[in-house]
From Swiss-Prot:
Biological processes, Gene Ontology terms: formation of cytoplasmic translation initiation complex
Homology family: Belongs to the eIF-3 subunit E family.
Key words, A-Z: Cytoplasm, Initiation factor, Protein biosynthesis
Gene that this polypeptide is encoded by: int6
Domain PCI: 256-425
Function: Component of the eukaryotic translation initiation factor 3 (eIF-3) complex, which is involved in protein synthesis of a specialized repertoire of mRNAs and, together with other initiation factors, stimulates binding of mRNA and methionyl-tRNAi to the 40S ribosome. The eIF-3 complex specifically targets and initiates translation of a subset of mRNAs involved in cell proliferation.
Entries under Pfam families matching the protein: eIF3_N, EIF3E_C, PCI
Highest rank taxon of the organism: Eukaryota
Protein name, entry field: Eukaryotic translation initiation factor 3 subunit E
Subunit organization: Component of the eukaryotic translation initiation factor 3 (eIF-3) complex.
Organism the protein comes from: Aspergillus terreus (strain NIH 2624 / FGSC A1156)
GO CC, any one term: eukaryotic translation initiation factor 3 complex, eIF3e
Amino acid sequence: MAANVPPSAETLLSGAAAHPPKTAEEIANQYDLLPKLIPYLDRHLVFPLLEFSSGQDDDKEVVRAKYELLKHTNMTDYVANLWKEINNSDTIPDEFVKKREEVLAKLENYQEESSKITELLQDEAVVGNLRSDKVANLRFLEEQHGVTLDMVNSLYDYGRFQYSCGSYGTAAELLYQFRVLSTDNDKVASATWGKLASEILTTSWEGAMEEVQKVKESIETRLFNNPLGQLENRSWLIHWSLFPFFNYDPARDVLTDLFFSPAYINTIQTNCPWILRYLAAAVITNRNRAHKNSSAYQKQLKDLIRVVRQEGYEYSDPITDFVKALYIDFDFEEAQKKLGEAEDVLRSDFFLVSAADAFVEAARHLISESYCKIHQRIDIKDLSTRLGLNQDEGEKWIVNLIRDTRVDAKIDYKEGTVIMNHPPQSVYQQVIEKTKGAFFRTQVLR
């Protein structure tokens, strides 16, 4: 019988004390996606993520990780300096000196091999005679200027080598020149991925978005009869697209639409459900931009809710849990709790740190909008708590909300309440509205 006695208050309190709330650092570590992201990124694209970790993790471990990441590249001077830092030495082994000499010799050789064709492609008179037909272009250059297929391929090899050396701007130009002339579909596809990476690493976001579109088209056409290849390549493109997603405002709508398209949302659900974090963050922060197209935003939100509900058993974090609490469970207390955790996750995520403030702002708006829709009289202190604000901050927030959204409401400062002037309804209208509300919740949950 004793085993069935409910626990005392003291036992419950001591249990709570044994499990104190997690710190921001613990939450960030628990939901760190770096191990999930790395397999889908080129090693050069991983480097900025490790740089971001330098201020958060053990610096020695990060330095060692950078060394392991880049030791097989041709960034010889940088790798040598990492080795010196790891080994606390002022000198480097002879193997680094030898590799540096080999890299310089290869650079000189590639430059000589490609000098003729690069000079021709910088000549306006020559470029003016080029057309969209690659075969005709190559024939023209061969007949008029003695260009060979080996010379064209040297642009590809030289571009890849420059990329391996960390000269991303030069690599982008060489790979572009190669792509203009080559009819080798596999190499052209590889060059397009290389140019996308180069544009990302030089933060040329407009150019990166052009390459995202080219890679997407290549996946659809070149891998048309290879569903597994399409799945893998789409997974890579989704991860690479995260760089412009949150760094270039014009990319936001384009990539949100891409991620929600049938082929790509299926890829996310099948292969990389953790991308829901970034999709959710994009949709929530898009609330601040909703004036551009409110109906489009509502569709994004509805699509997000549907996917979060479907994938709840496969993946969740405080960002997706916030969506679940607010729009699936209609639990305002849980939504406020998850918003606090989400902020910690956002500030520790390389891609989302710059969107953290916008996310919190938009999320508070969404909580308050939902809360105001279902309450006639709102206690300012209670709503402030749900928004993670003190009473003074909450009061200012609500004043701004009423002003910005033009809702019909007034604040009773004496009582500390907001009175929502929902229009009076007939019994018939109340039945209709309740039916519509039930229908809305049903639609959201589908």
